[in-house]
Every structure is written in C-alpha cells, then in structure tokens.
Amino acid sequence: GVIGAGGRALSLNRSFAENANAEIVTIADLDPRRLPRAVEEVYRRQGSKPKTTGDFRHLIDDNSLDAIVVGTPDHWHAIPSIMAMIAGKDVYVEKPDSHNIVEGMRMVAAMKKHKRICQMGSQHRSTTRMQTALAYIKTGALGRCLVAKAWESSRQGAIGFPKDSQVPAGVNYDMWCGAAPKRPFNVNRFHGR
C-alpha cells in the first residue's frame, strides 16, 4: 500500500507499479482530488487498479499488505511508519524519515522490536546516473577529488503568497495537520502549488 498520491508519492507509485516484484493494492490520501490521477498512473503501468481510501489507517489494518510506502508531507513520515512496523509491515519512507530526533529514535525502536525493514528513500543518490558518476570519480580518472558540488534547478516559477482560504471539500485537514500546530488552510502549506 502507498500512503500519499501526489508529489513524491505519485513518482513512487509509478516506480513501484513498474516493478515486477511489487503490486500496489491500495493508495491512501486525505485529498480525494489526488486519487484518480494516482490510480490511473498505477493502472497504466501495472494493469490493475488499486483501491483507494482517505484514511491511511485502513492500510495499516489490512493484513493482506506486507509493506507500506510513506510519501506524505514531512511531518507525517514517522507516525505511519511506526504504526506500519508495529502492524508487521516493512516500510519505505521518503526523506526526511522523521520530523525530529525523538520520532527517529521511535522509528528505530519499532524497527528493531518488530524485526521490520525500514528504508528511507534518497532518490538522487540512488539513481543510475549518480551511481555511474560516483563510480567514475572513484576510479581516480579525475585525480584526487576533494569536493563535489551538484545542483538541480526547477523552472516551475514562484509560488506566490496566496491568502489563507477554506479547506477544499472532502479534505480531512485536521488529519493532515496531525501533530503539527493547527493553522488556517493555505494552499502553499498544503500542496505547494
């Protein structure tokens, strides 16, 4: 199961759906507007449509799932990861794996206690092009390398300063806030763009 249907989660949905060793059975997202696109992306790659839910806890409780992918906003990485490991599921979680050191320590404790695998994703370090570049540097072909710098530019433009607004229909904003301080809804805090 995948928790999240936009941003990094959408990209992860694509990757796992193309993997012959994985099947995305259910996608959870508390914004119902994001689910149709995620389902379609998975269907095109995997040939079957995943179920959807607005509450990630349904994935935690589903005994047919053996692993959970956590592609939520940063402040929601640790809690579902810990819950999944307690429920006997392995976890792939996006970076950062936790919002603070205490959450990180609790994740490690859950992983050890329940003997689960918990991997934090770091897609740029894991890509073929980065691995190829690193292998080339290690050959010594460039001489002794003391520092390497890289950057990535995005041409999406400025996000602006939208005013706070009403929560979109169907969105469980209280759940989205979770343990974070409750603030008025703002599209830049919620989805960015």
Question: Can you say where each PLM-predicted feature lies in the sequence?
Answer:
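Short, small-residue-rich loop/turn micro-motifs
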Residues: G6, D31, E152, A180, ...
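Residues embedded in well-ordered beta-strands within globular domains across many folds
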Residues: T26-A28, V69, L146-K149, C177
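Glycine-rich, aromatic-lined ligand/substrate-binding cores of catalytic
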Residues: A169-R193
